[in-house]
Structure formats: C-alpha cells, structure tokens
Amino acid sequence: MTQAAETELLQRVWDYPLFAALYGRRSRRFGLGFEIAEGPFRYRSRHAALPLDEFEEALLVAAGTGVSGIPLWDGSRPPAVRRGDGRTFGSTAHGRCTALFFTNDRGVFVIDPADVTASKLNEIETRDERQRVLALYRQHRRQLSDGRLAIPRRVPPLFGHNMWNCNMPGTTLFMPVCDVSFTLISLILNLVDGEAGRYVHGHGGGMHIIDDRRGGRAAGTEPWLASGLIDREKVLPLSILERQACYFMFSEPAVICHNIFLATEAMGLGGWMHCGFLSFKVMQALGFRMVGAADQAACANPVGIDGVLEGFCPPYFPSMDAAVDAALVRISHGRASESQPYTMPPSENRDAIPRAPSDAGLACTKAVCRYIHETYGRFPASVDTMHLMWFMQAHHLDPDYYRRFFHSGALGPTHAAHMAAWHGDVAER
C-alpha cells in the first residue's frame, strides 16, 4: 500500500460517523478461512485466511487505548494526585492500569504506554497528527513470544460455542488485563486521607476499614482513630472495599474492547467481543505468575508477568509498604508537566493543591495494605490481583458466507469495500 493510500484510509476511518458505527455494530463472526462444520449454517470458506496488517492493528489499538490529551481535572481545585494523560477509555481512581495483550499469527504482544504523558489538551488535532498512530503503535508494542498464543481448543478453557472461530489463523485476538492491586491502593489512600483524597474532604473524617471476615476488627486503621484522621462511625467493610476496587477497574477492559469493536465497523472488519472462556487458563498460557494464598482452599492468584505487568504487591515488591510507595509514584506521574488544561498560570492555583498525601494518610494506607497481605497472604484479599474478562477478536470477513445466508443489510458499506480499498492486490487475485 502506498503512503498516499494509507493516508486516505486513515482519514476515512477517522471521519467515520460515530452514530453510524454505534448502530451498524454487529457481531460478525465468520472470517476468511473459517468453517462451520454442522447445522443449517454449515459452510466452509473458499478463501485462505488473511491476517490483519500492521496498519490495521495500529488503528484498532489507537481506538482502544490511545493517548487523547491532558485530563481536564475540572473540580473545585486541582486534585492532589492525578494522571498526566487522558486515554480513549475512561478511568477512575487514577487508574489506567489495563495492559492490552494481543496475539496474531506472528506472536504475542502487549501494548502498555503507561509512561506516556500527554503534551497538550488534545493530543491529535490536525489531519497530519493522525499519522502518529502508527509510530506510537510501533513505539509501545512489545513482542513477548513468537507464534500465536496456544489457547487449547477444548472446553475448558473455551466455551463450546466459541471453539469454531475463536483465535483462528488470520485473526487478531485482543486481551485487556487490568491490575486491581494498583486501584485498591489508590482507593484506600483516597478513602482514609481527607487532605489528599477526593472522597473525603478536609482533615479527618476518613473511612474506618474493618475486616468483616474476621469479626469486624479494624483492618489497620485503629491507630488513627484517636487523632481523628479516621472516623469510627464511617465503617467500610473490607470485602465491600475490594469489590468497589473491582467496580472501578472493570469498566476499563470493557470500554477498550468496545472502542476496538466500533473501529472495526469504521474499517470494514469483522469480529466480536465475548467472555466465553476461563480466564485462569488463558492467563497461565500468557505466562502470568500464579501465587498461592495463606488459605489453601483459595485458588492461586495471578499477580503478573515478570518484567511486563507486575502487581503492586509481593513477590514484585519486598513489602506492601514498598508497593504503596511505588503506586504513589505512578499515581503522581505527570504532575510536574508544564502543560496544563487551565487558562490561569500554575502559580495562581498551586496553593490550592493539597500536599499529596499527608504523612498520616500515607502511614494509614500502608497499615491497611500490610494488614490485608499479612492476614490473607495475598493482595487483594478476596479478589484476584489481575483480571482478564473480555476478548475482542478482529478478522477479515468472508462476504460470500453473508451473501448466502443473510439479507443484504448484514454487511455495511465499509465491509463490502474493505478488500478492494485496503488489500487491492489480494482482491484482484
């Protein structure tokens, strides 16, 4: 494909109407090289599988997890701890700790631009700046292994109705994995520290975290009740706290997959998102380290992949104190950036930004995290450190299948034109 043709396709995809993508979006599961071996829709593709090229994958990744610009931070005052990069997916509690893994015929890869700081309010404003998506994709794509990820084609790990087409040759399978340990640390800090946190305001009044699985005893907050940092009446059970951390995080991988899904509509690709698999087995195949718990009845906990995506907990840190310190560094990433979303100079709002965090708030946060790990032998206590909930698969459609079995509206104009526009040399064969 020539540079001019690539540029034209990029502009066409970027300008595709949002509502057309929303209302045209369908799960389109049958790709080139696929086969349905039984039933009334029995069909074997007459075409060979055709993998997505680098440009196609770069656009899908840009839609799923691209850096969009500086967050607005548009509250009553600039937050004490904040991220310096906005993404194409929303996040809570200083999150954005979802790494996008994917596999294709060439290998297994991960995209995690965690060290990126946005340079301006809208990172991509002009048509020329749109060209950066391919360079950014190459910059932040890391290959972990050669060859397609070996997900056993059986039940489990796959659910039976997905075995015929999931992770087939020619497909690109996206697998976003989120880190709940980071979010839990951030959430605890916000809930116990009124000065640095956004969920309680002013000095004191922090949540009193109790262990509802151990008779309601204090989960590390006891020393700060007398000082007023923690309010004895604001009781928060640990099990609910950890559930809340999951609620905060679980939107990220779903939105990433849905963004990619909408991009397939604009590009004319097939695919669908699903959770028809056992994540434990898939994460083992990806190479996640599984750590046992103090309670041997509990399943092993996926804590990370060494040097790739590491949880904020042992064994990746010598203690939970060290993990909290590291999480705070990540939470505060981008605070020193000279680029701000405000019209007022930083000197006019600097005094309004509280110290992050207070000494007492940091000490209390560490105490709660130590309590969890020392009591349960894992962090978090009741949920896994890492979660994989969604697959988003993208592939080239076989239009012959849809022409045979479906009405004309089953494929949109982008699907009908995709092969000629994106792969003219293949379409002419």
Q: Model-derived features: where do they sit?
A:
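Acidic, surface-exposed loops and disordered segments
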Residues: 1-429
